[in-house]
Amino acid sequence: MNINPNNVEIIISAVKPDQYPDTGLKEVALAGRSNVGKSSFINTMIGRKSMARISSKPGKTQTLNFFNIDEQLVFVDVPGYGYAKVSKTERERWGKMIETYITTRDNLACVIQLVDIRHNPTEDDRLMYDFLKHYEIPTIVIATKEDKIPKGKIQKHLKIIKQDLDMDSSDTLISYTALSKDKNPMIFNAIEKYL
């Protein structure tokens, strides 16, 4: 899959189904804890520095942000989960918004769940993965921030993630750093299987 980074645009920020765009394209949702690196992941994957806003403040994404990727697919950036400084009401609202999107959206082809390779998956990570499996949503798990651990320990950390999430053998697990585009073809190939 060849992406022209000059042909990427944010279509809409939505909070409810009647605001979802009608592109006819398949969608790939990006889910993960606040500050796991979703915005950096999007920017690196599409080869644009600031398409998705990067913030050191967790909980910045509060809507479903739809990005048209070169008229080939749509990335949907969903609010990060597990951020304690947001009110319980707000967290529940985000949770409902994400659940509605994932369980009702016909265009959804798969979900990329991002986890931090440096740490064991959290309870929230496990709940999200189990939720996706319950609804039989194809899932690609991306272990971000691989540049933060020694190369020799990457496989060990991936094994822990696979075990902790009790991953299906059919699901893909890829380690990743936003500092390099080397893994982009591998990730786009994994996505393409579901389009």
Swiss-Prot record:
Per the record, the domain of life is Bacteria
**Presence of keyword Protease:** no
* Keyword Zinc in record: no
Give the residues the record marks as binding GTP: 32-39, 59-63, 77-80, 144-147, 176-178
Q: Which GO terms describe its biological process?
A: division septum assembly
Name all EngB-type G domain ranges. Answer: 24-195
MF-aspect GO terms: GTP binding; metal ion binding
Q: Which SUPFAM superfamilies match?
A: P-loop containing nucleoside triphosphate hydrolases (SSF52540)
Q: Which UniProt keywords apply?
A: Cell cycle, Cell division, GTP-binding, Magnesium, Metal-binding, Nucleotide-binding, Septation
Q: Can you cite an annotated GO cellular component?
A: cytosol
Where Mg(2+) binds, per the record, is at: 39, 61
Residue span of the signal peptide, if any? none
Give the transmembrane region(s).
Answer: none
Cofactor(s) annotated in UniProt = Mg(2+)
What is this protein for, i.e. what is its function? Necessary for normal cell division and for the maintenance of normal septation.
Q: Which HAMAP family match?
A: GTPase_EngB (MF_00321)
Q: Which family does it belong to?
A: Belongs to the TRAFAC class TrmE-Era-EngA-EngB-Septin-like GTPase superfamily. EngB GTPase family.
- Protein name per the record: Probable GTP-binding protein EngB
Q: Which organism is it from?
A: Macrococcus caseolyticus (strain JCSC5402)
UniProt lists the gene as engB
